């Protein structure tokens, strides 16, 4: 995988600045704008997987189609993060229950601390696993346009198992891209965040596509 190109490929498009500008502005539209941007990122991912020299699609084309794909991509992401949401809910529920059934304040504090610590560690592990699986789920949907492909966990775990090293690298680089977007966007008077985060999403699309192309041959 060419990690460096995941940041540079965007500027290889002659109209990259216009696409990043418009993408950032569209993301300001509540709900609809964010879903469209997700659909745009998905189409970029599809183009990366297909090996197109200039993967960035045109901004504004097939608005409805990208909107629907963005919604479905949101559904995929929501389902994958559902276990993490449930763990967080269980962690929060424990505090009032223990406060109600235990009279000793010190004991309550200790029990809640252990409870929260255990769920915190478990949530961290689950979050990392989800972060490692998501590139393959997104990519399978992007390549096939079939929602069910994103939930073929046997194939997805097989890809991850045979490409655990590259998957970890993608997870780390993706996190760094998000951090860089936050720092640079904040420096640009805050408003720059909408453009730097959109840029970071396009970096994610390339990373996911490159990882998926590397992993495809490992699953029949």
Identify what each model region corresponds to.
Residues 27-50, 111-150, 182-219:
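Selective recognition of hydrophobic, aromatic-rich stretches within alpha-helical transmembrane segments
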Residues 99-112, 151:
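Membrane-interface interhelical connector segments
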């Amino acid at each position: 995988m060419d990690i460096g190109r995941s940041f540079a490929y965007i500027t290889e498009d002659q109209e990259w600045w216009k696409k990043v500008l418009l993408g950032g502005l569209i993301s300001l539209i509540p709900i609809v704008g964010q879903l469209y941007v997700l659909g745009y990122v998905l189409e970029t991912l599809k183009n990366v997987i297909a090996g197109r020299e200039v993967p960035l699609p045109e901004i504004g084309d097939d608005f409805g189609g990208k909107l629907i794909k963005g919604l479905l991509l949101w559904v995929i992401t929501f389902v994958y993060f559902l276990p993490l949401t449930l763990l967080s809910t269980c962690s929060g529920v424990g505090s009032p229950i223990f406060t109600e059934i235990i009279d000793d304040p010190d004991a309550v504090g200790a029990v809640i601390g252990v409870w929260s610590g255990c769920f915190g560690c478990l949530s961290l592990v689950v979050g990392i696993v989800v972060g490692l699986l998501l590139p393959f789920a997104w990519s399978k949907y992007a390549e096939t346009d079939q929602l069910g492909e994103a939930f073929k966990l046997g194939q997805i775990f097989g890809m991850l198992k045979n490409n655990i090293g590259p998957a970890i690298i993608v997870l780390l680089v993706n996190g760094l891209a998000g951090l860089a977007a936050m720092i640079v966007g904040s420096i640009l008077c805050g408003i720059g965040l909408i453009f730097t985060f959109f840029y970071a999403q396009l970096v994610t699309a390339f990373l996911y596509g490159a990882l998926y192309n590397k992993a495809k041959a490992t699953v029949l």
